[in-house]
Amino acid sequence: MRRYVWRGSFVECDLPDRPLEVADSWRHSSGRTNGLDLHLARFSRAAGRLPEGFVDRMLPLLHEGELFPRIALSQGQLLLDVRSAPPPRPATSLTYVCAPDPRTQPEVKGPDFDAFRAYRGRYQRDGTDDTVIVDRHGSMLETTTGALVMWDGDALCVSDGAWLPSVTLHQVAARAETLGLPVVRRRLTPELAAAHPLWFLNSLHGISPVSELHVGDEVITPPAHPAAGEWRDWWWGGFTHERGGGIGI
């Protein structure tokens, strides 16, 4: 990993890890991204307008390989971490647990990262990829690293609770609406997952159908969505080369 701090331009540094007030991250594939403008807008809503030239100077640092860059605001400094990206996860296995919500700011990415690590360390089952966050009724809200959506026939169902405004969820919901498919808010429960397709969404793995939901000693296997492959191809086909210039918030 390479870390940079913004001082009118990016300066490589060895600052230690510390709490983040705001963060955002995305897959950067050989200079191509999917929805970078949406990620920058989400970051700027919480952290304030990015400095002039920030994006134009960032992109040349991200032109090669499969990367998972993260920008962050920490103690008044803007940071850029250039990290390697793992291979996309074709399916996701989740741990479901009824535990206190670890989030302090559900709609801001960054400040709860340490709490999420502790939450996974305490509750996540070996062999699963992530842990579900639930409301006081046990309904699934999201996971510590991504959004959750469920399909009920042609209807795309999103949680009726509070969750991070996921860029990938926004993209999926926008496509559903373009196709004339209803998007509805609903309680997402393990019982429903036993009979309805459940998808994990984030900008690193795209659309990753949930293959297993571990609930205590039971393993729920949500059914496959018949068009999952088409949807995944659509999302991965949305990567384009970024050249800066018009991108900036």
Language-model features, listed with the residues they occupy:
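A contiguous pocket-lining binding segment that forms or flanks enzyme active sites
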Residues: 155-173
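Conserved alpha/beta cores of soluble small-molecule-handling proteins
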Residues: 1-139, 169, 173-249
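Glycine- and Gly-Pro-enriched alpha-helical subdomains that act as flexible
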Residues: 139-160
